[in-house]
Amino acid sequence: MTTVRLTVRASPERYQLPEPVDFEQGTMTDLAQKRILLLVHGFANPEDKAQGSYKKFADGLTAVNESFPDAWGAVCEFHWPGDDRRGALASTVTYSFRVESAHASAIRLASFLHEEPGLTPDLDLYIVAHSLGCRLTLEVLREIAKKKDYKGPVVREVALMAAAVPVWDCLSPDGFKPDKTRQEHVLYSRRDMVLHYTFGIGQGIFGERHSAVGLKGRPDKRWDTRTSTGLRHGEYWGNNKVARRASRILGIGPVELPEHYPPQVEFDIAEPPRFRNMAGRLVSWRK
């Protein structure tokens, strides 16, 4: 099955403002499957780096279930100008412009999902995003919610990895609101030095001093599941444990136990093995 590549990146000779969504690879026929997995990269990712990250993630899912994606649905890469073409340092210095670019890209993507005739409400959309791409994703969901006559695919599951999103934006009445029609999952890490240090500096430009969602997984009650990964900021896309966690979100992971069995324990994948073994013995004793 062809991987679809959507882009809002401008041509090199133009200023890096997001353009209308365009098919860089694949067609609407490839995209309009019953289930669509949309991948959204983060901050300071040139297109080739994003493609490499997406491939690692897709390969990880295939390693969990070899029938993915052929028997599951479509895989769609989304590319947006989250970087400055002059390099990583320029991207960091112009962080405020990257945030604005994420917002503008979200508007473009939400319009595409709403207006594209081949994308209809009988299709299910799953989104996995990383870093500043998580903010872009939440912006997309907010834009969709504004459209009372939204005609696009239904968002079923959202997984936010190392989310570069202020916690306050997920608490404020004017921020990103949850929706009972979808599940929202957070994968976070207290060891993420990018979110611990760099994110705070970047947000200070906007007068915001709140910590990032992807650092501690807060606000706790907002998310349907929270998974501590113990990973560094750039380690998510190619991590096997993250792939297994995502596979369960997509419904291609290990089969769940029948209801009459005790519930499975969802261990923190960053926990030391000795704590996992101790918890496992406790569960066995209770049986």
Region locations from a protein language model:
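The conserved beta1-alpha1 loop
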Residues: 38-41, 130
